[in-house]
Amino acid sequence: MFAAEPRRAVLDHGRALRGNPRLINVLLVIDNFDSFTFNLVQYFGQLGVEQRVFRNNEITPAEALALNPDRVLISPGPCSPAEAGVSLGMIEAFAGNKPIFGVCLGHQSIGHFFGGHVVRADRLMHGKTSPILHHNSDLFKGLPQGFKATRYHSLLVERATFPAALEITAETAEGEVMGLRHRTLPIWGVQFHPESIATEHGMNILKNFLSLN
């Protein structure tokens, strides 16, 4: 029995999958106290993913490793990476071991962990959409250029000090970093919210993550 238990019951979607959860992706979700986390959980559930959800103060990296998830999601949140509980510790624990996906604060946490600077954005974005320009690879494979994505953030990973270990995979027309990946490890992040109803092709981004290793 682990010291930490999931905040929500394990989400088991699909009667045919019951009894053999290893047939599907098991996703560990680190919830940074954000309402958008539920939307992400719902979307991944629609894709048939079993999930274990913990708030960022409910589980340690060692306990998370013992759960042996297939993938890790670091959720959005209202704070900075330094204030995001165990989020940075989860990146350290799982980097190179399991695929990691960071959304908004999770994306910023990846940038921060690998040496980037997370700074105040020139523009406060609260429920606004921007066209996204991307490299048509990994998370963005098969997506049209300039698809609209919803943004809720006042911080972003600074382009001028972007860490060498990471690569920019998406941006706005103004050059703001909207997507990143590690150059050699299975780690990806997006600054915008793929789970927002106003984001185009959000479900496809999540599907693409599930196909990456």
Identify the meaning behind each predicted range:
Residues 196-213:
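Acyltransferase
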Residues 18-25:
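Short, Lys/Arg-enriched N-terminal segments with co-localized hydrophobic residues
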Residues 26, 50, 70, 99-101, ...:
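Structural signature of beta-strand start/N-cap positions in the alpha/beta core
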Residues 12-13, 20:
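Intrinsic-disorder-associated, low-complexity terminal segments enriched in Asp/Asn/His/Tyr and depleted
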Residues 138-184:
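Catalytic beta-strand/loop cores that center a nucleophilic Ser/Cys/Thr
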Residues 28, 35, 47, 53-55, ...:
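A generic "structured core" feature
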Residues 25, 69-142, 206-207:
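Cysteine-nucleophile active-site neighborhood
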